[in-house]
Every structure is written in structure tokens, then in C-alpha cells.
Amino acid sequence: MQTYLVGGAVRDKLLGLGVKDRDWVVVGATPEDMIQRGFKQVGADFPVFLHPDTGEEYALARTERKQGRGYHGFSVYSAPDVSLEDDLRRRDLTINAMAETENGDLVDPFNGHADLEQKKLRHVSEAFAEDPLRILRTARFAARLQPLGFSICRETMALMRQMVTSGELGDLVPERVWQEVQRALHEQAPGVFFDVLRELGALQVLIPELTDEQPFRQGLSALQCIHRKQGSTAQHYAALLSGVPEPDAVARAKAMKSPNDCRELTHLVGLFMAQLNGASPETRLTPELAMELLDKADFWRRPDRFGVLLGTLACTLQSEPDHLIQQLELAAHRAQSVTPHPFLQKGIQGKALGEAIRKERVARITEALHLPE
């Protein structure tokens, strides 16, 4: 029974990056051997165990064979006779197919270290083509490592184009696609992820709304702005789709099974963009429009979300965003200062109360924006 550190931990250690998670492969053992040593089995599809002290994952060496289309179209073989090299061969990229012995010696049967030095992302074998999710993973690694000078080698780009042409990208379940997109949004250079997918023709399959040049470039520009501000996942995603018409953007967010906060913010950004982009700075925000937007954003019950929305709009609006954001903030602040109490004291109730509050809010917004009533 031999234990090896594998994958990302070895890669990041060689790159001089901080190692966050450590994964291990065990060769020459059975599930019973692991359980006898106090490990807890957690893997449903293949034998993965948690270390009794560290909680780190230890997987028995395994091979995978393609048997059908889609994520579940693989048969897994795990037994004591599976070698370390067999296990590493099933991995996606050579830089992820290295291992380290318990003595710290590097095991590198597929020249991953050389590719690290040459800053190349290269597939381990033709078996790469068996899993279409690897297209997204490779694009995501490009987004992570491009600032360090890495690029995808030509042979791997060619193989991925063939995979896109085969149509298997359409077999990926939305949850798996979203998982990769969500991770990519927070990589070092998230725009690279979408650039790679577009070059491969994969974006046409996964997010066809971004195929055209204008929404794609606008989305990437807004995405880079949000990324510099270290925005949330919802802000990143809404920024990415900010050049897409609101109904189409929301439909894509739903189809991709993104979380509710992503869908809601995508919807609001689309609404505000449609109302505020294009018109002159003097005419595009009237008190009535400000009230309408505050209502649509549910500002009265969710003021914190409105702040998130404004932070996103600061990156998505095409002209004079700072001035417009300041106006919206001021309008919201002044409108929020109106309370029912003075009207209730005057005996105003029911529908008349709501109308009186709204009228006063519009008046205060008008005053705040220095507009004639």
C-alpha cells in the first residue's frame, strides 16, 4: 500500500503557489484496508475516503472507460492492481497528472513538469476527448494561469474543436456547466475562459446569447470591471450578460440553473440598462422613473440588494455611470426618509396612505435631484 500526493497540490507547489487542498491516491489497497485504518468512505461512484485525522481525501487508484454519452457514461475500475501511472493517465492535463511520493520525489510519467516550465496546457492522452466537461476545465485553467504566461497548446485546441463538433457538449447537464462557469468567474482572468470557449465554438452551444461581437465585448468589459472590484458571483454573472436583452439574459440564467440571486440580479440589471442606457444624462432619470426603478428593485424591503445592483450598474452602464449612480443613491436615500407616521397622524389610511407616501417620495426625489416640480 503506497500513498501519493497528486494533482493540483503538486502542480501549485511546483509553481510556487499556495497549496489550498491536498488530494491523495492510494495504490495497492482495498476499501476494507482503508476502513481498517480508520478511514471513512464517502465516494458513491468510486472509492474515496476521508483521513481520520486530517479529513483530506484519499482515493484508491482507478481507471475509467467511456461506455456511453454524458457525465455518467463511464465505467470505473478500482483494484489493488491499478498502478499510479494508470491513475494519472485518466487525468485531463499533463500539469495535473503529476504525483509526489511520501519522500517528496516527483512522479511525472507524462512530462507535466516540462509543460509547467514551458507554460503549456496540454492533454494527457486522446482519452481527454471522452469527457466534454474537460473543455470547460481547460478553459478555466487558462483563465487561472494566463496571468502567469500559460496558454493552451495547439494540439489540445484542435482536439477540443473536434469535441465541440461531435456535439457532446450538449450532453452536459446544466448543473455541471454552471459549476465550471461559477468557478471561472472568480479565476485570475475570467474573460480568458469565455474567449477560449468562443474560439472553440463552444460558446454557441453553452451561452449562445454571447456569440455576437457586441454583447460579448460589452459583457467581458463589464465582467473585468466587476472582477477588479472583487464582486459577488451574482454580480460577475449579471455583468457578463449585461449586453444581452433582459428576457434572453434571464432565460439563459434559468436554463443554466444558476442560483436565484444570479437570476434576480441579471433581471434587474437588464431592466435598469434598458431604461437608463442611451438617453442623455439630463433626461434619463426623472423622479417618476427613479420611483419606478426603486419599486421594481423592491428597494423598500431589500435595500441591501439595491446597493449590490448599483455596484453592478457602475460597471455595466455605458456612459457617465458615476453621475447616474450618485443620482440613484441620492434618490433612494431621500425616498427612504419618508415614513407613514406623519400621514397616519393626519388620519390618512388605506389606499390614500400609499398614494400620499408615494407623492411625498417623488417630491423629495425631485428636490434632491434639483429639478423643478
Swiss-Prot record:
- A family per Pfam: PolyA_pol
UniProt binding sites for CTP:
8, 11, 91, 137, 140
Q: What is its EC number?
A: 2.7.7.72
Q: Does the keyword Ribonucleoprotein apply?
A: no
For activity, the cofactor(s) needed are:
Mg(2+)
Coiled-coil parts of chain? none
Give the highest taxon in the source lineage.
Bacteria
Give me the residues that bind ATP, please: 8, 11, 91, 137, 140
Q: Please provide the record's keywords in A-Z order.
A: ATP-binding, Magnesium, Metal-binding, Nucleotide-binding, Nucleotidyltransferase, RNA repair, RNA-binding, Transferase, tRNA processing
GO annotation, biological process = RNA repair; tRNA 3'-terminal CCA addition
Q: What is the top EC class of this enzyme, as a single word?
A: transferase
Question: Which annotated residues bind Mg(2+)?
Answer: 21, 23
The record's catalysed reaction(s) read: a tRNA precursor + 2 CTP + ATP = a tRNA with a 3' CCA end + 3 diphosphate; a tRNA with a 3' CCA end + 2 CTP + ATP = a tRNA with a 3' CCACCA end + 3 diphosphate
Q: Which GO terms describe its molecular function?
A: ATP binding; CCA tRNA nucleotidyltransferase activity; magnesium ion binding; tRNA binding
Q: Which SUPFAM superfamilies match?
A: Nucleotidyltransferase (SSF81301), Poly A polymerase C-terminal region-like (SSF81891)
Q: Say yes or no: keyword Ribosomal protein present.
A: no
Q: Additional comments on file?
A: A single active site specifically recognizes both ATP and CTP and is responsible for their addition.
Free-text function comment from the UniProt entry? Catalyzes the addition and repair of the essential 3'-terminal CCA sequence in tRNAs without using a nucleic acid template. Adds these three nucleotides in the order of C, C, and A to the tRNA nucleotide-73, using CTP and ATP as substrates and producing inorganic pyrophosphate. tRNA 3'-terminal CCA addition is required both for tRNA processing and repair. Also involved in tRNA surveillance by mediating tandem CCA addition to generate a CCACCA at the 3' terminus of unstable tRNAs. While stable tRNAs receive only 3'-terminal CCA, unstable tRNAs are marked with CCACCA and rapidly degraded.
In terms of HAMAP family, this protein maps to: CCA_bact_type2 (MF_01262)
Concerning its family, UniProt says: Belongs to the tRNA nucleotidyltransferase/poly(A) polymerase family. Bacterial CCA-adding enzyme type 2 subfamily.
- Entry protein name: CCA-adding enzyme
- What species is this protein from? Marinobacter nauticus (strain ATCC 700491 / DSM 11845 / VT8)
